[in-house]
């Protein structure tokens, strides 16, 4: 039985990515026509690492950055989200090993400034980290969002 891959190993495994593909008919209903870039996990992590304290980024900005970088119409919404999640857990793995300079995953939001409850420690961990950096978190129905998050978005 082979050992389970660590989050860090998952992040490093590019599986032949990035690659740019034509948007399929099934996908075009929601995303339009053109091309989609499926990024390498490391690329998503690199963008997340660029966000300084007090600043934020959303998955949508990451996708736009990837699309521009690869001259694609869009960045893949599914894999970009999955790779951000892997990056978050790899960061916590690094922290557990005593590394200080980890990927600040708590600064990467879902669209609309929403906190990602799937990140390590859930909403509570994110609230503590984000409030410590000067952000105000409000509840909108079942979601938690950062008030005026647009004002804190990083320009890449």
Regions found by a protein language model. Give the residues of each.
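Nucleic acid-binding interface residues in structured DNA/RNA-binding domains
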Residues: 2-156
């Amino acid at each position: 039985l082979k050992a389970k891959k660590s989050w860090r190993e998952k992040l490093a495994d590019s599986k032949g990515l990035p690659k740019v593909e034509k948007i399929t008919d099934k996908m075009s209903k929601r995303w339009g026509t053109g091309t989609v870039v499926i990024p390498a996990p490391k690329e998503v992590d690199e963008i997340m690492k660029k966000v300084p304290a007090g600043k934020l980024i959303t998955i949508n900005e990451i996708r736009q950055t990837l699309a521009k970088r690869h001259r694609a119409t869009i960045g893949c919404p599914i894999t970009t989200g999955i790779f951000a999640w892997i990056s978050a857990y790899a960061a916590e793995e690094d922290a557990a090993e005593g590394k200080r300079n980890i990927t600040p995953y708590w600064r990467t939001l879902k669209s609309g400034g929403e906190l990602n409850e799937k990140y390590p420690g859930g909403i509570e961990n994110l609230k503590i980290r984000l409030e410590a950096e000067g952000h105000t978190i409000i509840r909108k129905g079942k979601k938690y969002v950062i008030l005026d998050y647009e004002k804190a978005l990083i320009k890449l």
